Amino acid sequence: MALPRCHRLRQRDRFPALYRGGRKLSTPSLLLRWLPQAEIESVNESRFAIVISLKVHKRAVRRNRLRRRLQAALLRLRDRLRPGFDGLLTVKPGLDLDTSTSQFLQELEDLLTRAEIIHGRQ
């Protein structure tokens, strides 16, 4: 299941700001860049985009499957997300594509907890 629209980062002008001035944290397979949302925006929900380059896998089918699994992991954590953040999740090359969704969930939860975007562990 895909992320709800309110949790998707779709504004193209926000991406350069995340690359330039976003704070960064990483794990062996994921990189998170995040920024607080601008005060101009009245969006309360935290929004995320997932980037998977050709370096991860050349086949779009595999990249899309990976994207869906990351979205599923984000969906499980959505109730614990603090509002007001824009995040960009980048999958690093060399990731084992057969990693289970529960491992993604654990790694993503660790990353978001360190970034203080979610409320503590469950």
Curated annotation (Swiss-Prot):
EC number: 3.1.26.5
Record carries keyword DNA damage: no
Gene3D superfamilies named among the record's database cross-references: 3.30.230.10
Domain of life: Bacteria
Catalysis: reaction(s): Endonucleolytic cleavage of RNA, removing 5'-extranucleotides from tRNA precursor
Coiled coil feature spans: none
GO cellular component: ribonuclease P complex
Keywords, sorted A to Z: Endonuclease, Hydrolase, Nuclease, RNA-binding, tRNA processing
EC main group: hydrolase
Pfam families on file: Ribonuclease_P
Entry's Gene Ontology molecular function annotations: 3'-tRNA processing endoribonuclease activity; ribonuclease P activity; tRNA binding
InterPro entries in UniProt: Ribosomal_Su5_D2-typ_SF, Ribsml_uS5_D2-typ_fold_subgr, RNase_P
Any GO BP: tRNA 5'-leader removal
HAMAP family found in the cross-reference section: RNase_P
NCBIfam families: rnpA
Subunit relationships: Consists of a catalytic RNA component (M1 or rnpB) and a protein subunit.
PANTHER family reported in the protein's UniProt record: RIBONUCLEASE P PROTEIN COMPONENT
Function: RNaseP catalyzes the removal of the 5'-leader sequence from pre-tRNA to produce the mature 5'-terminus. It can also cleave other RNA substrates such as 4.5S RNA. The protein component plays an auxiliary but essential role in vivo by binding to the 5'-leader sequence and broadening the substrate specificity of the ribozyme.
Family to which this protein belongs: Belongs to the RnpA family.
Name of protein: Ribonuclease P protein component
Species of provenance: Synechococcus elongatus (strain ATCC 33912 / PCC 7942 / FACHB-805) (Anacystis nidulans R2)
Gene name per UniProt: rnpA
